[in-house]
Structure formats: C-alpha cells, structure tokens
Amino acid sequence: MDRRELLKNACGLGVCGCALGILGIPEKARAEDTGAVDQRLAFARYQVAKLVGFVAGATTPEACAGILEKTGRECAKLGQLGQFKGNPEGYFAAAKQNWGTDFTWDKEKGTVTIAVAEGPCGCPLVDATRTPALWCNCSVGYQKEAFETIFGRPVQASLKESKLTGAKRCVMEVRLS
C-alpha cells in the first residue's frame, strides 16, 4: 500500500475528526466512542502522536504543517461537501446540527470563524496527553478544502485556538481570497 492509499483509507475510516459531524454521525454514536478505548485505537493514537513528533523533528515546522494540511484536504475530499457548493448556510446548519460547531460569517470582510464545540478533541486518533498541537494543521487543511469547495474559490485558513494547546474550543478563521 502506498502513502496515498494509506491516507485515503485512513480518512475513509473516519480519521479526520472534523469530518464526522459533516458526514452526519449522530451524537449518540459519537458519545459511544468515548467509552473504554480499544487497545488497537490506543496503539494507533500513540503511533500517530509519535509519527507527528518524528516528522516535526525531521522537517521545518512549515513543512510539517504543510504535510498535515494535505492530510486534512484529503479527508475533506472524502466527505459530502459537494452538496454544499454555493450554500455556505446549509453547511453551517449541518455542522451545527451534527457536530455542535458554531460559525460566524462576516460577508463584508470575507471571513468565516469556525468554533468547534467544547469538550475533548473530536479526532479519534488524538491522544490529548501525547499528540503535538501541530496535528491541528490537519483541521486547517480540512477547512481550506471545505470552504474552497463551498465557495468555489481559494481561501486562507488559520488556527486561532486549539484544544491541544489548552483552549476550551478549537477556533479557526477562513478568509475568502
């Protein structure tokens, strides 16, 4: 299996926590995932945390962030974002209903602020005690791909707050180009 296949399969299995809500995973199903951790999942979380640390140590922070953003973009491509092309309000409503995500859209400034619900990180591969905050660049890439699909033009995305750095919520900002 090559790297692309691995990433595609991993994202298809729900690796990107941001995608779970958009894909319509009900709250009850997500809540059940917070029970006893399967040893395989615990091992995967450990390995992902180590992998991110190794990549961060072997590259520049910018290169590592870029790799993780690409991972997030691939995850977003596997979702059902196409149904929201030209319909950002529909996307906002679906994410709010399915994931508890809040959106603030300043049409004049061309910015969208995304505030993920409080609580533990939604990514099933995150071990909050081990995973470096660099991992959050995956979510930045997801947001870039999502909003480029929705608005049909390039966007810039940035992470403002992260649960992995101690914030209560993850907050991202998207700027339309």
Segments predicted by a language model, with ranges:
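N-terminal secretory signal peptides and thylakoid transit peptides that target proteins
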Residues: M1-V15
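C-terminal segment of N-terminal export signals and the immediately downstream linker at the start
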Residues: I22-A56, C75
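Amphipathic interaction/junction segments at domain boundaries or subunit interfaces
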Residues: V55-W135
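Active-site helix/loop of acyl-thioester processing domains in fatty-acid/polyketide metabolism
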Residues: L134-G152
